[in-house]
Amino acid sequence: MEKAFYRDTWAEIDLDAIFYNVQSMKQHVGSHVEVIAVVKANAYGHGDIQVAKTALEAGATRLAVAFLDEALALRKKGISLDVPILVLGATKPQYAPLAASQNIALTVFRADWFEQAIVYAPYEQPLNVHMKLDTGMGRLGAKTKEEVQQMIYAIEQHPSFILEGVYTHFATADEQNIDYFSFQYDTFLHMLEWLSIQPPLIHCANSAAGLRYPDRIFNAVRFGISMYGLAPSQEMKSLLPYPLKEAFSLHSRLTHVKKVKGGEKISYGATYEAETDEWIGTVPIGYADGWLRRMQHFSVLVDGKRAPIVGRVCMDQMMIRLPYELPVGTKVTLIGEQQGDRISVDDVAAHVNTINYEIPCTISYRVPRIFLKNKSIIEVRNAVL
């Protein structure tokens, strides 16, 4: 992956913000609680290895990803074998020995998984597993006492397996109404009584639960969205126990500036017509970069002023109405701060009627990531080259 890029569009990742958010969570939950840094989906679009290393430096003790490939990628990129990595999604039984050899723990939730995984035993290294219990999310997890006890029996009978953890996932921890959260929490407590083995790790808290209920998270918290400085929901913004620092910003530069007359039209479909003489700037970012067509009419920052996107967003470019003539090369901020004004990830999410999680995840590999510490560039990643 190249350290240079040749296009006037880039994302900036503030690693100091990541560090602060992890340290703040550690202080919030207490020293007896491990912080598991969730770096799936390329660390929510921020950069997996850079965020992982920063989170570990800040005090996280483990990493979590969505599937085995992501875990193996972290190992290849330099995360040492002494750092445990948990795969949160399903993994085929035949890959269990590979995971074990790389100190990658797998999520298990079916007894028949063990029946198939045993075929590949004995393993050179035992496999750590985390048993997932479905307390009401309805996604992955065992639901009955029989299922749980069958898995426990399989683990007890085969030295290739170690029950390292048991966990569940809350569906509504980020909502003000706590009824369903309380139901899931009580269900988890009840299901834990089915275990004849006490695993070292018991975890139920995502970012929302960790922030709101530090007394109900057992001994580990899976720190995802708020590690990146984003509130788990709009409802939770007023409930945050400490301020979060947003790590992701997105920028570009004007590549063309022109004056159009009233009545002239802009972009595909000729959906925008200038009412009077206007200055129009072209910005080299489009929906192939994850800046969706639905961003039409959204305003970005240029020279500290709000400039609306006019006409349809193209695959690689878009046009904005400038407040006045500006030179080619002027910086355009799509997410982030400029001259005291700020556009947040939440602002973008609200415009396209989605959640903040989706925005940095959507910004594609075509957009280089610049990593900052102490406001200085320490690394550039360009996945195109």
Swiss-Prot record:
Biological pathway: Amino-acid biosynthesis; D-alanine biosynthesis; D-alanine from L-alanine: step 1/1
This enzyme's EC code(s): 5.1.1.1
UniProt-annotated binding residues for substrate: R139, M315
Active site: K40 (proton acceptor), Y268 (proton acceptor)
Keywords, alphabetical: Isomerase, Pyridoxal phosphate
GO cellular component, one term: cytosol
NCBIfam families referenced in this protein's UniProt entry, alphabetically: alr
Protein name as catalogued: Alanine racemase
Taxonomic lineage of the native organism: Bacteria, Bacillati, Bacillota, Bacilli, Bacillales
Gene: alr
